[in-house]
């Protein structure tokens, strides 16, 4: 697991920016702790706000159909309507989306 809390997300993001100069990141959902996907923990909001604050576009790829919570479904839908954070089914769609924002 690469991202388990706000600090690990921030460390990851800053390292990618420093080493590559890139401000668009794609990450498989398996690299993110399961707590992220339970909105009651507020971890997702805190982590994603860091990406927005640092002006880094971020896509999480994977199958999100197992999350039955209406609030999680609404959260994913709302993110996908924006221009900073995306939850997409695969890397190809993520590259396509991040190249247009």
Language model regions located:
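Amphipathic, Lys/Arg-enriched alpha-helical "gate/interface" segment within cytosolic domains
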Residues: 1-101
